[in-house]
């Protein structure tokens, strides 16, 4: 039930790749690009926070081992089933369609069509077309290629599918305690509820 830290490292790479792609596309200064990178960072660091929290709130067992806080660990994993997908979506948005439509390296090296590819697929003048294509291929691999197996589907089902975490959150969430806190603040006595008429009770609801 302690799962999620590895996804943050991959997320850092993907966020960095998206930022480089924005530079190479000449769009890094656009406000919506900046906002997407902020959102990606926010989601990724939230996963990191959850991982740190469930570890810091862990406790020592009788055998001398340490176990993470089960509620926070399952909250972490539940977030892992969602956030990487949104991070990938934003990376694809920033990268642009060329990420999946770019010609092959063989085409780029071709004596006849290579110069045309170099000319028409260049982004900013200071960056080579080859470097632009390299960063897009990296994003493609993390979002859709072989690396996506570990970042997307494994995030969904690794260490338990989403419903497994929800079962544990329901068990560990201590809802009865939360209800008691609310009743205390509202000065509700269970005994007094007996004297409330049915019609009055419905009006509260």
Features from the language model and the residues they span:
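Short coil/turn segments at secondary-structure junctions
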Residues: 2, 28, 64-67, 71
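Loop-to-helix element that buttresses phosphate recognition and phosphoryl-transfer chemistry
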Residues: 38-60, 79, 92
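Alpha-helix capping/hinge segments and adjacent helical runs
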Residues: 71-193
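Secondary-structure edge/capping motif, primarily at the C-terminal ends of alpha-helices
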Residues: 19-28, 51-62, 94
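Single conserved hydrophobic/aromatic residue that forms the stacking wall/gate
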Residues: 194-205
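Short, charged, amphipathic alpha-helical segments
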Residues: 34-38, 67-74
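Glycine-rich beta->alpha junctions and the first turn(s) of the following alpha-helix
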Residues: 1-44
């Amino acid at each position: 039930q302690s799962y999620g830290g590895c996804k943050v490292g991959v997320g850092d790479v993907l966020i960095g790749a998206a930022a480089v792609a924005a530079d190479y596309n000449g769009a890094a200064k656009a406000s919506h690009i900046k906002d997407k990178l902020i959102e990606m960072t926010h989601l990724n660091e939230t996963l990191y926070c959850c991982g740190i929290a469930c570890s810091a709130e862990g406790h020592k067992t009788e055998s001398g081992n340490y176990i993470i806080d089960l509620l926070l660990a399952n909250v972490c994993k539940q977030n892992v089933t969602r956030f990487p997908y949104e991070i990938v979506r934003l990376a694809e948005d920033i990268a642009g369609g060329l990420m999946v439509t770019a010609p092959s390296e063989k085409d780029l090296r071709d004596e006849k069509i290579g110069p045309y590819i170099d000319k028409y697929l260049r982004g900013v003048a200071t960056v080579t077309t080859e470097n632009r294509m390299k960063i897009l291929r990296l994003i493609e691999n993390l979002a859709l290629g072989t690396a996506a197996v570990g970042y997307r589907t494994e995030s969904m089902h690794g260490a338990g599918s989403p419903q497994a975490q929800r079962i544990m959150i329901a068990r560990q969430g201590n809802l009865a305690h939360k209800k008691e806190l609310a009743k205390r603040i509202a000065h509700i006595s269970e005994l007094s509820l007996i004297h409330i008429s049915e019609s009055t009770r419905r009006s509260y609801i």
